[in-house]
Amino acid sequence: MYSISLVVNMQCISAYGSILSLPLRSNLFSVRKLSSFPHKSFSGQHGKLVRMKATPTRACHDQESNRKFKRLPLSKWGHHFLSAQVDVSEMNALAQEIERLKPEVGEMLMFSSKSIESTKKRILFIYMLVSLGVAFHFEDEIEQSLEEGFEKIQEMIAGEDDLYTISIMFWVFRTYGYNMSTDVFKRFKGENEKFMESITSDVKGMVSLYEAAHLRTTREDILEEALSFTTRNLESLARAGASSPHILMRIRNALCMPQHYNAEMIFAREYISFYEQEEDHNKMLLRFAKINFKFLQLNWIQELKTLTKWWKQQDLASKLPPYFRDRLIECYLFAIMIYFEPQFSLGRVSLAKINTVFTLVDDTCDRYGNVSEVAALVQCVERWDPDCMDSLPDYMKTVFKFAWNTFEECENAGIMEEGLSYDVQGALEEWEQGDVVPTFDEYLEIGGVEVTMYVSIACSFLGLGQSSREQAYKWLKSRPKFVEAQAKRARLMNDIAGFEGDMSRGFDVNAIMYYMKQYKVTEEETFTRLQKMARDLDTTVNEEILKTTKSVPRQILKRAIDFGKMIEFTYRSGEEYTHPEGRFKDHITSLFVDLIRL
């Protein structure tokens, strides 16, 4: 969804050879090919290759049939935010109260006692700060507390048999990159080596164990068991409806989207409502969380007003056929998932604009352009020269101008002094020879590079300062296993969610099709296996995060992690970006329309 499509590239290879690539560069980007990035060599011992002649698809038909595109749902939001009114005096008052309450909350975190019980309470309090969406105010204090706490981990867990406490401590330490051992959960098993049924009566403990289980790494069987055990029991509780309403909502939200995968502010909106209904909630902490959230909401609404005005000025609807997805607000929601904090306003707005460019280019290639037009557009973007537009049809000139102007805006705003360029040319050359369809594993490697991290995550770093961006790009260029696993997982989720749409448009360049052809299995069995493969990649991602924490600054690693959450959010219940009903609409409403009540 964020790039010139691999589908079109592969369709065009036999006709156009190596000119087809995945560029992302303007004069502000240094010219770097993907071939300059270390590539894993494909094994000389391939699985069985599937050889076939290239067959024309809808994108390769004549001009008339190629223009038979499916009209997608219009934006539900239109110019809604253009008329939004934000009271600046209210924002100033909220900012002042945040600054007044912040030291008091900080004292609750950093109280002087260094006893084991106090340290334990501090870790539990960190979970509250994260869940309520205010942890970014106290990152230094949190890191200090966790570093001190992890040194005392054995003392803290000794004799501790409260499921909630153990699970929350595990979640917090793992989330911040501290590799707390899973052995701590053995105390909740009986003589039969299974989790004791008695713990099912501790509903909050069960939810916390469920959340902790999603931070499992490879070969952590006890957490696999915990996930199965808690999922089964929580689903039963949700069906029975016997708990209090706010507990039931917490269970259902967790089953729908575990906290580990959820966007920080989406989870915070839900958790604030949950925490308010807890009898033992801290009134001052709750007020701080609410004031902070409303302040963020007003900032976001201001930015959406600016973005909506910008989008209206582009007037793409009058310049292009209605083949593309009008998803400005959804693009901004994605940006919120990467950068929600007030200080990242410029990066957030720029990222939202860039997301609209990627969406338009992707739809142009996937849904409307024919092979020769796409090839011409790719060449033009590769050269990044407005003079080359003469070779483009009129509608593609509009697409190129929009991309050019948007990147120029970001450059002029000072958000893109340095960047990366990616080109799939080298990776695709092996596929060009002899009409050979790549093996499933080869497709996953190159497909993952193309559609997810190695382009989109580079743009996700744009909100960081220049020195941090340079460090982030250097890390990304090393092709870390964490990003590689995220990319493969995203490729699988994208292809699983988009399979029916791909087939309806005649595109068979899809992980499901490659797997079925290579391994001679049914579509149903393929879906089952690939879904398991995606789950297994979860554990690899978690493991690599723990390995990477000490070598990569948290502000860089967090953007990559949050990008993975964005992918999870988009595809967990289908291709919701294309059809943004349900959760997309609900979350946009809760974040940008319904202001939190103080």
From Swiss-Prot:
Pfam families reported for this sequence: Terpene_synth, Terpene_synth_C
InterPro entries per the UniProt record, alphabetical: Isoprenoid_synthase_dom_sf (IPR008949), Terpene_cyclase-like_1_C (IPR034741), Terpene_cyclase_plant_C1 (IPR044814), Terpene_synth_N (IPR001906), Terpene_synth_N_sf (IPR036965), Terpene_synthase-like (IPR050148), Terpene_synthase_metal-bd (IPR005630), Terpenoid_cyclase/PrenylTrfase (IPR008930)
CDD domains (UniProt xref): Terpene_cyclase_plant_C1
GO cellular component labels: cytoplasm
Binding positions (Mg(2+) 1): 362, 366
Note on cofactor: Binds 3 Mg(2+) or Mn(2+) ions per subunit.
Motif residue range(s): DDXXD motif: 362-366
GO BP of this protein: diterpenoid biosynthetic process; terpene biosynthetic process
Residues that bind Mg(2+) 3: 494, 502
Enzyme class: lyase
SUPFAM superfamilies, alphabetized: Terpenoid cyclases/Protein prenyltransferases, Terpenoid synthases
EC number: 4.2.3.-
Molecular functions per Gene Ontology: magnesium ion binding; terpene synthase activity
Metabolic or biological pathway: Secondary metabolite biosynthesis; terpenoid biosynthesis
Positions that bind Mg(2+) 2: 362, 366
Tissue occurrence: Expressed exclusively in siliques.
Gene3D superfamilies named in the record: Farnesyl Diphosphate Synthase, Terpene synthase, N-terminal domain
Known cofactor(s): Mg(2+); Mn(2+)
Keywords of the record: Cytoplasm, Lyase, Magnesium, Manganese, Metal-binding
Domain notes: The Asp-Asp-Xaa-Xaa-Asp/Glu (DDXXD/E) motif is important for the catalytic activity, presumably through binding to Mg(2+).
PANTHER family the record matches: OS04G0344100 PROTEIN-RELATED, TERPENOID SYNTHASE 9
This protein's name: Terpenoid synthase 1
Species assigned in the record: Arabidopsis thaliana (Mouse-ear cress)
Lineage, uppermost ranks: Eukaryota, Viridiplantae, Streptophyta, Embryophyta, Tracheophyta
Gene: TPS01
